[in-house]
Amino acid sequence: MLRLLGRVMSFLPMPPPPPPPPPPPRTPGGPAARQLSRRPCAPPAPSPPAASAAGGEKKRRPPEMLLSSSWPSATLKRPPVRRGPGLGSGTPQPATSARVPPQPSPGRGGTSTTCSAPRRVACSHIPAGSTASGTSAGAGAGPDDATRFSLNLTPEAILVIQRRHLEKQLLARPRRPFPTPSADPRLPLVPCPRTRASTLRRGGPTSVPNAPLAVAVSSRPPRASLLPGGLQATLPSPCPSSLRPVLKVSLLNEKHKYDDEEYEEEVEVVDEGLVRKCTEWLRGVESAAAARGRTGHLDSLPHLSTL
């Protein structure tokens, strides 16, 4: 590789000699301007010393460093990149070191432009995890970093995020407390007006000693439903004292579960054929009982032949 680079360097053309320094600029205006400059109040023009200083710097530079922007010379003369002990060959450089612009040396004018371009391009391919420290600092982050970042989510991920947000909102809402039943088993529940009216209309036992239990059974607390087995779904209380009142209510619900429903009496339909067969059967039985003493056992049952 070094031999190939030496051959390439041998075929490079010789650099031309440095150009002569530019002449000092002439002041416009001709002799009129010269006459004005001879006055004592006019300040001296500072442009000729600056031009002569620039010409002196160009003279001091060596002739071989003026045109050193070719690829072999730039890559050979560039110092190696310094890497920390934790960074390997495959890991990218941090964003803070990549965003710092390289300081151009006084003798290398063209190499700074050729080396800084690939470093800035490689900065955009650094993953988001490594650029987090650089963006949080805010010193080297520019306005183009915010526009460069883009987050693409699938529709399933968007639905999951929305569902979790709704669940958090529902959990954050204050819920109304449920009405707790009284812990004292001796206090009866408040009767429902519908069941009270139906009990009075039917003439139910109100003066019986078991009347409070019947009233307590017929009156169910709000939001309580009967289960298929006749048990009543009671709301959970924070401190259940005993299961005795719940047991009484469940047993009485099983006994009086049809109290709220009213049935109409059906009109009886008489089947004349069935009545006629029954009367004939009864007549045969009577005649058989009358002739029991004079005939045999089978002859006394004439109705069996009709079957």
Curated annotation (Swiss-Prot):
InterPro entries to which the protein is assigned, alphabetical: PRR18
Entry keyword set: Methylation, Phosphoprotein
In-chain residues carrying the UniProt-annotated modification Asymmetric dimethylarginine: R186
Phosphoprotein keyword on record: yes
Modified residues (Omega-N-methylarginine): R108, R202
Keyword Phosphoprotein: yes
Sequence positions bearing Phosphoserine: S70
Pfam families, sorted: PRR18
Composition bias type Low complexity, residue spans: 128-138
Comp. bias intervals (Pro residues): 13-28
Entry's transmembrane regions: none
Protein name (record): Proline-rich protein 18
Species of the source: Mus musculus (Mouse)
Gene name of the encoded protein: Prr18
